[in-house]
């Protein structure tokens, strides 16, 4: 199968080259970095922020002289949030002889391009994908040689939230409700439960809930089981109505969630009185987290007139990690850049200090966010626990 995918990718590359009439030799005018993002369609709000972070990073690198004495140029391809278009984007970017590709940042779009990226040997950094099978083949358990990420993995954020609940909220009995048809939510639910139970605490309520309204069936169960914290892994389209329903029915226990809660919808769509004792994991803690975060945040505000979100920060870090790798190896050739990315240690970024482990996953701290006067605020920083996938 691997040999077949290599042949298929080569044929795609040859066809694109023949049709475009482009040269495959590196450009003499600039270092090209490709982006494969959903600039329209599904995921556009996430990817637009990611692209802004990338553009800011590119401008900052060019302001200090570019890379290898050459300006950096972004080759942007819109994948429309569709897996088939994400595949086509890899073909287009390969023909342009980019040194690296940033994105996709949607999991389904990223999964589908993995074989082609491995075949054409161009490093791909996913800014925001957190599921484990992005960097490691789930069947062979082999690490993809050319796939990297700037975000921490779901195992890290699930364990970090359990750690925060146990040690700082001092809770003992947790309930977990999760959306059953999302790999993201199911994985996080299990990571949290395992870490919470490993301490000797209990998770007496662990229930998949597809329709938010069905949560009303379990309100009395929460009381009977004396639950003192509730974990709701999922994206904001499911968790916002879940938070609203639970709070409106008098559930006052702390509500916990993952990075899928970040973004303006929480502040906009949830009554401010319901956000008390609400906590979620995130990659970016705002401009107060570190000096690197402050520099990024201020530069972003000066360029765009608004403060950045986590996706912008992750896009920025993905670009800067790539730029540092190019400078270290003094080459813009894609295989050289991939080899150097593997050596990333203590990159000082907007989302924290990042090193890459043997699986090409980001070793970094996890931020626990809460709300004050309806606005996100850093509650705690949970150091990396030393565990990988």
What are the residue ranges of the model-derived segments?
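Extracytoplasmic "Venus flytrap"
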Residues: 30, 34-55, 77-83, 105-106, ...
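Beta-alpha junction/loop-to-helix N-cap segments that form part of ligand/metal-binding clefts
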Residues: 23-29, 45-52, 64-136, 208-215, ...
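An alpha-beta-alpha
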Residues: 75, 142-208, 229, 322
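Periplasmic-binding protein-like
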Residues: 93-105, 123-127, 175-178, 226-236, ...
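Extracellular/periplasmic bilobed ligand-binding domains
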Residues: 115-120, 185-281
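Segments of small-molecule ligand-sensing domains
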Residues: 302-312, 323-377
């Amino acid at each position: 199968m691997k040999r077949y995918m290599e042949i298929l990718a080569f044929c795609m590359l040859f066809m694109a080259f023949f049709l475009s009439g482009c040269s495959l030799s590196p450009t003499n005018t600039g270092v090209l970095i490709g982006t494969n993002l959903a600039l329209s369609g599904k995921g556009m709000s996430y990817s637009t922020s990611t692209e802004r972070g990338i553009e800011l990073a590119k401008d900052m690198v060019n302001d200090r002289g570019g890379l290898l004495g050459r300006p950096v140029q972004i080759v942007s391809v819109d994948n429309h949030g569709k897996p088939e278009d994400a595949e086509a984007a890899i073909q287009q970017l390969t023909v342009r002889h980019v040194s690296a590709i940033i994105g996709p940042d949607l999991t389904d779009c990223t999964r589908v391009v993995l074989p082609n990226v491995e075949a054409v040997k161009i490093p791909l950094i996913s800014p925001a994908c957190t599921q484990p099978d992005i960097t490691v083949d789930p069947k062979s358990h082999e690490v993809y040689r050319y796939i990297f990420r700037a975000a921490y993995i779901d195992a890290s954020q699930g364990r970090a939230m359990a750690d925060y609940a146990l040690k700082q909220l001092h809770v003992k009995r947790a309930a977990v409700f999760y959306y059953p048809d999302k790999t993201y939510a199911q994985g996080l639910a299990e990571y949290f439960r395992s870490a919470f139970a490993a301490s000797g605490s209990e998770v007496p309520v662990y229930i998949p809930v597809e329709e938010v309204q069905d949560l009303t069936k379990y309100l009395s169960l929460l009381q009977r089981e004396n639950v003192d914290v509730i974990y709701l892994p999922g994206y904001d389209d499911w968790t916002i109505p879940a938070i609203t329903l639970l709070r409106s029915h008098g559930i006052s226990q702390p509500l916990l969630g993952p990075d899928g809660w970040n973004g303006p919808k929480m502040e906009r769509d949830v009554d401010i009185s319901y956000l008390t004792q609400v906590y979620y994991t995130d990659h970016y803690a705002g401009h107060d987290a570190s000096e690197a975060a402050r520099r990024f945040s201020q530069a972003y505000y000066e360029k765009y007139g608004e403060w950045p979100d986590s996706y912008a920060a992750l896009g920025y870090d993905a670009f800067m990690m790539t730029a540092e790798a190019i400078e270290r190896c003094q080459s813009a050739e894609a295989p050289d850049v991939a080899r150097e990315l593997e050596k990333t240690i203590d990159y000082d970024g907007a989302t924290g200090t990042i090193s890459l482990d043997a699986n090409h996953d980001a070793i970094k701290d996890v931020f626990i966010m809460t709300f004050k006067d309806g606005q996100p605020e850093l509650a705690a920083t949970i150091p990396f626990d030393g565990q990988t996938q």
